[in-house]
Amino acid sequence: NCGNYGADGIVGPHHEKEGSYFTIKQVWCPIQIRVDSLDSQFDGKLRIENRYDFLNANTCRFTYKYVQLPSVTDKGGMKVMKQGEVNCPDIPAHGVGTLTIPAAMKGANALLLTVTDKNGNDLFTWSYKLEDIAGLQQVSAGNKPSYKETADALTVDAGGRTFTFSQKDGQLKGVKIGSRTISLTNGPRFIAAKRSDRSMDQFYNHDDKEAEKKKTQYTTFEDAGCFTGFSVREEGNNVVVTANYKLGCFDQAVWTISPDGTAAIDFTYNFSGVVDLMGVMFDYPEDKVLSKRWVGDGPYRVWQNRLHGPQLGVWENEYNDPIPAESFTYPEFKGYFACLLYTSPSPRD
C-alpha cells in the first residue's frame, strides 16, 4: 500500500461499490466458468467448476445472452439477439462438469453468462467477445480531399474539416470544423516511462537515497529521433499522408483522410528498453473533457494485482478526478482499462 495512492478498496463508507467489489465477486464465485476466451465457432459447451463445499451445482441456473456490441459509429447500446435459461448440470461439490447452451449465433459478437443461486441471487456475470467489432467506416464517396504544403505546414481539407500538420515535427497541430477548433494537438508522438524509484532494469533503485519518495512518480524517456518529411499520395478518393522519422523510436505515422472528413491513423514505433508504460500520445486540454463512452472491460479500471472483475460491455461515465478517500465518485474516469476495443470521449469543443 502506498498511502492514499494504494489500490482501491471494496466498498466506500456508504457502501459505494469500488472496483475490488467486482473482483471479489468473480474470484470467490462458487460456480466458476473455466474458459478464458471464445470465438464465433463456439459450440455451446463450457467447462464449469463447482466450488461449493456442500451444494450440488444443479441448485443454480445460468442465463445466457447473445448480444451485438455497437460499432464505433453506433451510438446505441448492446442489442440482445437471443437469450434463455438453462439449469446447471449435476456436479457434486468441488467437482467439474460441462454446461451446454445453444451454439454461437450469426450476428452476435459477444456472449453474456449470468449464474444465479438457489435463492435467486445473481452470483456473477461473465462476458466473452465472439467476433471483432466493426471498425470505423470511412466514406470514400464525394469530393476528393485537397491538400497544400508550405514551408511551415501541410494542410488537408476534406468534408468541411481542415487538418494541419507541422513541417517541423510531422505532428497534427489542429483540426478545424467550420469555425470550431478541435484542441487535439501534438501527436502522435512516442512515449515510454518507468517508475522513478526503479533502476534501468526495473528493480528497486537502492543506490538512490530519494527512491522512496519517487514511488508514485514516473520518468519518461526522450525520443531522440527526428522528422524527415511528409509523403502524400492519393489512394482512390482518399488522401494518405505519411510522416516519416529516423534515428529514434517513432518510425512513421500514416493518416488516411476520406472525402467525408474521417481520418484514420496507423503508426509504427520501436523500443528495446524495460518500461512500465509505452505507446503514443496527443495533447488535449483536460478541462475540455466531459465524459467518455467505451466498449471494453468495465465499468472499473484494473490494477496491478486486480485484473479480475471488470467485464466486456458498453460503458460510459462523466469526467472525474477524485483524490482517494476525499470523495467517493465511482467509477473512476482515469486509469487503465482492460481489453479496450474503442473509446469515444465527449469534448467541450
Where does each model-flagged region fall?
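Extended substrate-binding grooves/exosites of carbohydrate-active enzymes
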Residues: 1-47, 53-58, 63-78
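Buried hydrophobic-core signal for structured, non-transmembrane domains
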Residues: 45-52, 111-115, 160
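Short, acidic/polar linear motifs in exposed loop/turn regions
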Residues: 52-56, 119, 271-273
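Short beta-strand/loop motifs in extracellular/secreted proteins, especially
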Residues: 58-62, 109, 276-278
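Solvent-exposed strand-loop boundary residues in beta-sheet-rich modules
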Residues: 68-72, 119, 178, 286
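Intrinsically disordered, low-complexity Pro/Gly/Ser/Thr-rich segments with frequent PxxP/GP/PP motifs
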Residues: 73-106
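Beta-strand/loop-rich accessory regions of lumenal/periplasmic or secreted enzymes
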Residues: 104-106, 135-344, 348
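Terminal connector regions
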Residues: 105-137
